[in-house]
Amino acid sequence: MREIISIHIGQAGIQVGNACWELYCLEHGINQDGTMPSDTTVGVAHDAFNTFFSETGAGKHVPRAIFVDLEPTVIDEVRTGAYRQLFHPEQLISGKEDAANNFARGHYTVGKEIVDLCLDRVRKLADNCTGLQGFLVFNAVGGGTGSGLGSLLLERLSVDYGKKSKLGFTIYPSPQVSTAVVEPYNSVLSTHSLLEHTDVAVLLDNEAIYDICRRSLDIERPTYTNLNRLISQIISSLTTSLRFDGAINVDVTEFQTNLVPYPRIHFMLSSYAPVISAEKAYHEQLSVPEITNAVFEPSSMMAKCDPRHGKYMACCLMYRGDVVPKDVNAAVATIKTKRTVQFVDWCPTGFKCGINYQPPSVVPGGDLAKVQRAVCMISNNTAVAEVFSRIDHKFDLMYAKRAFVHWYVGEGMEEGEFSEAREDLAALEKDYEEVGAEGADDEGDEGDDY
């Protein structure tokens, strides 16, 4: 079996996690208490969904996941929520005091006390796997727990499970909407370790997803639940081929191979189509070319950056539902002829496609319409650098005055770490610039950087 362990860190990670597991359970017909009426082979772990769920002898299906937070309120909601019987109590780990939006608390003081317990739980989950494939890590880098404890856990996972792939779903601060003043500090410090310790990181940002909800679903005031359900569709599409059998399966390590041209250039944009409300879907059925064009639209991107400002290095298209390879090839051929979607000159083909016949599921009473076919795109585009330069700019404004730095130093950080992380990000921006530059032949002498 090729199992995947999901790790949800901090409030954002946990709430996205709730949406994801809710959707997985719906897709597999697993009840809220973990029973699965359709599973006839009780205790036999060869079903495809066992990549994400382990089965007990009594026929209960338990998610291979842990939820970690430094303060209890968010995890208590899981403990008392609709899916409380789904998770093993040991999988829900909460501390007593908050990271207070402070990377240093999450990484050094408060996080240090809880990280061994987390790794112990991960070890238990890993021992339960026959062929662990990798980890999905969910966190936000604006707060303290997601950024600090997230980085710490990733660093420790690299030590314990060096060869396993780690995919991050990371919520980055939005350009306009901010939930904390020190977001730029936390993001820069955290990205410093994401660079080192994740194999692929998918960037999400709330503002972009708010806009998609407003525009495509006509929700005037989207809540986090609306956002998370949209995010969970993307994550579900990414992992469909691990959980169901399909025509062209896409493995987690395949994402890495196909999307990451250089180890550091691994920050991805994602988009999903069709995002339509039930009222609209009732009157229109979208074809493969239509949804394929939709995922390349700048307005469908789940992070605030414009792919037209950059070039694509690679992209993965995961189709699900009523889709045949012939349609996909035709749609991709059309995209290639379009001048709007530009690829770097050293990577002319750039498309990886997966098809899965399991149609997309939707949460009953949710906002998304039930559709026959959907597509999710994960793309590596040089425009992602916009996200970093925006955060770096805000970081510089504050750091020039050393504003708020004492809170970090007081928790045992050194000021040098700020400048080190900032330099690393400056180098990353430069890397993206070089990768997108015309003509790859003149860069032969700079191969040592990677």
From Swiss-Prot:
GO terms for biological process: microtubule-based process. InterPro entries: Alpha_tubulin (IPR002452), Beta-tubulin_BS (IPR013838), Tub_FtsZ_C (IPR008280), Tubulin (IPR000217), Tubulin/FtsZ-like_C (IPR037103), Tubulin/FtsZ_2-layer-sand-dom (IPR018316), Tubulin/FtsZ_GTPase_sf (IPR036525), Tubulin_C (IPR023123). Mg(2+) binds at residue 71. GTP binds at residues 11, 71, 144-145, 179, 206, 228. CDD domains: alpha_tubulin. The active site is at residue 254. It comes from the Eukaryota. Undergoes a tyrosination/detyrosination cycle, the cyclic removal and re-addition of a C-terminal tyrosine residue by the enzymes tubulin tyrosine carboxypeptidase (TTCP) and tubulin tyrosine ligase (TTL), respectively. Belongs to the tubulin family. Dimer of alpha and beta chains. A typical microtubule is a hollow water-filled tube with an outer diameter of 25 nm and an inner diameter of 15 nM. Alpha-beta heterodimers associate head-to-tail to form protofilaments running lengthwise along the microtubule wall with the beta-tubulin subunit facing the microtubule plus end conferring a structural polarity. Microtubules usually have 13 protofilaments but different protofilament numbers can be found in some organisms and specialized cells. Tubulin is the major constituent of microtubules, a cylinder consisting of laterally associated linear protofilaments composed of alpha- and beta-tubulin heterodimers. Microtubules grow by the addition of GTP-tubulin dimers to the microtubule end, where a stabilizing cap forms. Below the cap, tubulin dimers are in GDP-bound state, owing to GTPase activity of alpha-tubulin. This is Tubulin alpha-1 chain. The gene is TUBA1.
